[in-house]
Each structure stands twice: as C-alpha cells, then as structure tokens.
Design a protein with these regions (language model features):
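Short, conserved turn/kink motifs that form compact alpha/beta structural patches or helix kinks used as
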Residues: 4, 24-107
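Active-site-proximal polar cores
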Residues: 1-25
Length: 107
C-alpha cells in the first residue's frame, strides 16, 4: 500500500451517551478524527433479516497508522462520502506497520 492509494476521506466516530430534555439516555456519535483512507470492497452477501432480504457490503478500510487511528475499536463507525460503515474488528497493522486495516460493513 502506498500513501497515494489513500484517496477517500473517512470520518471516524465513537459512540457517546447523553441525556435528552426528559433525562433519558440517548445514544449518539461524536466525530473523533478524519483521515485519508482506501476502501477495498469484499464480496457482498444477502441475509434474511426480519423476513426480508438485507444486503451486506463488507469492506477493508486502510488508513495511515497514528495514535488516533490505533484508538479505533469495533464499537466505532466510519462515515465515507455520506455512507456509514460499522467497524467490525479492531484495526490490525500491515506487515510494514505503516498502515492499519480493519473490516467494516456498510449499513
């Protein structure tokens, strides 16, 4: 992987909890950082969810390794060109340790 292959901007978001006006806990998302990324789509699948077909679009996201990038967990998500990807695994370093790869799934 070369730095020039990172051609898409990805905003990584972590889950946050806050309280609404009624005091109820509300789940939301907070932007943590934005980085250049490469998306490599894997073979898509379909699954039956609640008696209807649901398509799945798994992909490998690659970003440059940094302290912020190493903080990403499988609870986070990435927003790329308005499309939301749930991070399915903690990032793992590439053999040269310059980049991190993670499995994500478009929702």
């Amino acid at each position: 992987m070369n730095a020039g292959d990172l051609s898409t901007r990805a905003t990584f978001q972590s889950p946050v909890q806050s309280r609404d006006d009624d005091g109820q806990v509300v789940q939301g998302w907070a932007d943590e950082f934005t980085a250049w990324a490469n998306i490599r789509y894997l073979r898509g699948t379909e699954a039956v969810m609640q008696a209807r077909m649901q398509s799945r679009s798994p992909a490998i996201l690659t970003i440059r390794s940094s302290a912020q990038a190493r903080a990403v967990t499988s609870e986070w998500r990435a927003v790329i060109d308005g499309r939301v990807f749930e991070v399915r695994e903690d990032p793992r370093p590439t053999p040269d340790r310059a980049f991190l790869e993670m499995l994500a799934e478009a929702i």
